[in-house]
C-alpha cells in the first residue's frame, strides 16, 4: 500500500481493507439467513445459573433500597441516571451492589463514563460507613465531567490502559475490583489483548473483574454488526479464556440470566421493565434490546479463585 494512499485514508478516518477471509472484517452478506437469537454452544464455559440466582438474593437484592437512580438526566452531571445509552438497568444495580457488598479497598476502572458515576456513588456510601475506597479510572478520552472531577473518584489517568504498569494491577487484593469497559476489539497491541493476556494472570486471589458488552451465550446483536458496523470480538476471546479455566469462575452474567432466567430478572429489577422503550429515540440505535421494550443487560463478572491460587503458588517439589 502506497504511503500516499495510506495518508488519504488517515485524513478521512478510514482504513480500506480487502474483502478476504484473511482479514478480520466480515462480509455482511455472509450473515444472510443467520439466526441472531440462537443460543450458541459455549463449550467449556459454566455460567453457574443456579449460583447466580443465589447470589442475586444473597449479595445483590439486599441493596435494592438504595437503587434510587433517576430514570432520566436531571441536570446533575455527577449523579448516575438510567437512559444514558451506555450503562443501563440490571448491569447498573448489580455493579452498585457488588461494590456495596464487597467494600473494596481499591477499584481500578478501565474505560470511564457513566459507570464511573455509579461506582463513585457506591464508594461514597461505603466511605460513609467506614470503608473508604480508592477509585482509579483509566481513560484515553475522558468526558469533560470526568476531567472536572467526580466526588469519590480518587484519580483519573488519561491514556490507554496498555501504558499502565502491571504493578498497578498487582495492588488489587481480595474483594477489590477491576472494572473493564474496553474497545472490545482484539488486535495487535489492543487494550483487550493487554488486559486478557497480561493483566488477568497477575491478579491476586479474590479480585473481582467486570467486562461490559458481553452477550454470551448469544453473538453480538445484529444491529451492532449490520447497522453500527461494530465488528467486536472481545467476547470470543473471553469465552476462550474462561473455557476449562479453573483459575477464574463466573459470578454473574447478565446476558445469560436474561436468556435462561428472564423471570428472575423481571422480578428483581423493576426499572428494567420498559427500560429501552422509554429511552430517548436518539440513543436507541446504539443500545441493544431483544424485545424492543427492555435493554439487553450485558455485564460479565468473574473472580480469581482462591483454591487455584493456593495450588499454583505452592512450592515445587
Segments from the language model and where they lie:
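A short alpha-helical cap/connector motif
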Residues: 1-108, 114-210, 214-317
Amino acid at each position: 500500500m502506497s504511503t500516499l494512499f495510506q495518508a488519504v485514508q488517515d485524513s478521512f478516518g478510514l482504513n480500506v481493507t480487502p474483502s478476504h477471509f484473511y482479514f478480520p472484517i466480515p462480509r455482511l452478506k455472509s450473515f444472510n439467513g443467520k439466526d441472531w437469537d440462537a443460543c450458541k454452544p459455549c463449550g467449556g464455559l459454566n455460567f453457574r445459573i443456579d449460583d447466580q440466582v443465589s447470589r442475586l438474593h444473597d449479595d445483590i437484592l439486599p441493596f435494592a433500597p438504595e437503587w434510587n437512580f433517576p430514570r432520566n438526566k436531571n441536570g446533575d452531571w455527577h449523579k448516575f441516571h438510567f437512559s444514558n445509552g451506555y450503562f443501563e438497568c440490571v448491569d447498573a444495580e448489580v455493579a452498585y451492589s457488588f461494590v456495596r457488598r464487597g467494600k473494596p479497598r481499591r477499584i481500578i476502572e478501565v474505560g470511564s463514563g457513566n459507570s464511573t458515576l455509579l461506582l463513585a456513588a457506591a464508594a461514597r456510601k461505603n466511605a460513609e460507613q467506614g470503608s473508604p475506597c480508592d477509585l482509579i479510572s483509566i481513560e484515553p478520552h475522558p468526558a469533560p465531567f470526568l476531567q472536572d472531577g467526580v466526588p469519590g473518584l480518587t484519580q483519573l489517568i488519561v491514556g490507554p490502559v496498555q501504558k499502565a504498569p502491571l504493578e498497578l494491577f498487582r495492588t488489587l487484593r481480595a474483594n477489590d475490583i477491576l472494572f473493564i469497559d474496553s474497545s472490545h476489539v482484539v488486535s495487535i497491541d489492543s487494550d483487550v489483548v493487554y488486559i486478557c493476556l497480561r493483566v488477568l494472570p497477575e491478579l491476586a486471589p479474590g479480585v473481582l473483574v467486570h467486562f461490559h458488552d458481553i452477550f454470551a451465550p448469544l453473538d453480538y446483536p445484529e444491529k451492532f454488526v449490520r447497522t453500527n458496523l461494530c465488528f467486536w470480538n472481545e467476547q470470543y476471546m473471553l469465552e476462550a479464556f474462561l473455557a476449562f479455566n479453573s483459575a477464574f469462575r463466573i459470578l454473574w452474567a447478565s446476558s445469560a440470566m436474561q436468556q435462561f432466567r428472564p423471570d428472575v430478572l423481571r422480578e428483581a429489577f423493576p426499572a428494567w421493565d420498559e427500560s429501552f422503550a422509554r429511552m430517548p429515540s436518539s440513543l436507541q440505535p446504539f443500545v441493544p434490546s431483544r424485545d424492543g421494550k427492555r435493554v439487553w443487560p450485558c455485564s460479565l463478572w468473574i473472580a480469581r479463585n482462591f483454591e487455584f491460587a493456593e495450588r499454583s503458588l505452592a512450592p515445587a517439589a
